[in-house]
From Swiss-Prot:
The active site is located at the dimer interface. Belongs to the PdxA family. It comes from the Bacteria. Substrate binds at T149, K303, N312, R321. It is an enzyme of class 1 (oxidoreductase). This is 4-hydroxythreonine-4-phosphate dehydrogenase. Transmembrane segments: none annotated. Its EC number is 1.1.1.262. Binds 1 divalent metal cation per subunit. It comes from Nostoc sp. (strain PCC 7120 / SAG 25.82 / UTEX 2576). Its cofactor is a divalent metal cation. One of its GO terms (molecular function) is NAD binding. SUPFAM superfamilies: Isocitrate/Isopropylmalate dehydrogenase-like.
Amino acid sequence: MYQLNQNQTVNTPQKYRPRLALTVGDPGGIGAEVILKALADLEIGHNYDLTVVSNKNLLQETYKQLSSMENLLPLADPNLLKIIDVTVDRETARQINLGTGNAASGAASFAYMDYAIAQTLAGNFDGIVTGPIAKSAWKAAGYNYPGQTELLAQKSGVERFGMLFVARSPYTGWTLRALLATTHIPLRQVADTLTPQLLTQKLDLLVECLEKDFGITSGRIAIAGLNPHSGEQGQLGTEELDWLIPWLESERQKRPHFQLDGPIPPDTMWVKPGQAWYGNAIVQHPADAYLALYHDQGLIPVKLMAFDRAVNTSIGLPFVRTSPDHGTAFDIAGQGIADATSMKEAISLAAELVCQRLHLEK
């Protein structure tokens, strides 16, 4: 049995304790482990009103298994947590195995999400922090969503939404914010999917988020080009000349409070953020936010800088949703070595965004 670190201090509780639902994600992955590790942190456990949406037996078995290991970080005791016990039928439950995803684990993780979304839309939670799911397991269970973000958008009835990745540097305190213009689509479809209308929609969402969630009413946004060297005057691709540069000129006229830089060659756009992450953010003058045009263009640099602490934030929803920026990690499930830093960051950021939206003191 592992005890909480008695040297930890607890801040005075906030005037308002954000009500957050924590979904455990795929029961075959590390979701239960990182949640129990995160909730053992007194800062998190005492400052926020947290409810875990999961099969209770999964949390108890995870706690029992991991507690028998030596040199393990503290774990929250499930018997002391607020848990909403969401179960699947016995036959499905018997098919769930630690370390792998299948139709059964997909059905379970979908049930956790479905419940949390319904209760949040009903006003019983202020936001959701989602554990990692396996898209292949969802598909095997008959749920054909590209990811959790798309399910959240559909259930919320919104058509405008985006994936914003947020990370605070432990070295300088600077905050990285990177929005993806396109998300879970094949690379060969990116150029045809990108349009001026789509980028205007994403830029609208980004500006609204900066103003509403981060209190940034003026600043600088960097926009990546699509092609190497941003096309190099049409020699390496013509999208920049054909429509991306004219689109940016039009957007600059409509948004005088924000400096829109771009299209910046994708490889060099991330130099200043990298320097600001590890060095002096004031000297480097990084942008307040970055708009990447496709998934890996944004997430490779984000994960290089902040793999253990980046947070996926769904913007455009009627409530706050965050998620740790890592997957199910089936290969290390049950070994006690999963890093809970990103889950802690996801919980803390969700609480901050809830308070910001409610105009309450943190």
